[in-house]
Amino acid sequence: MTLLEAISARHSVRKYLDKEIPADIIAALQDKIMECNKIGHLNIQLVQNETKAFTGMLSYGSFSGVKNYLVMVGKKAKDLDERVGYYGEQIVLLAQTLGLNTCWVGLSYRKVPEAYNVGKDEKLVCMIALGYGETQGVPHKIKTVE
């Protein structure tokens, strides 16, 4: 799948299958995360096999089966949200090309501090659910350029 195909195919997915992500795909994601962290001055982390963040009353948004996710962390700065969005979307599109599904999550998660690291001068901006979706998601209406 090309990058343009990934852009067209990618839709948010909230329900995931109980299917392990193969080691080669994890390695490709970790390589991209390292690259984005270095260039973007971020601390993005891939959390695997952790189910607490998307369960319980705080899991607004009908998430199910989420056990892998990205935590989007960086040093507090005026442009942190912009960098998280820019580099996060690069990882999301790579995941799509590798056959995975994703969903950006701003508020619908429970913090699980033992699963990842957020330094004193850092902020957890959001999370991105990651895995094999029950479906490929559905496209939403978008406004035309005109």
Language-model regions, residue ranges each:
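Acidic, surface-exposed loops and disordered segments
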Residues: 1-146
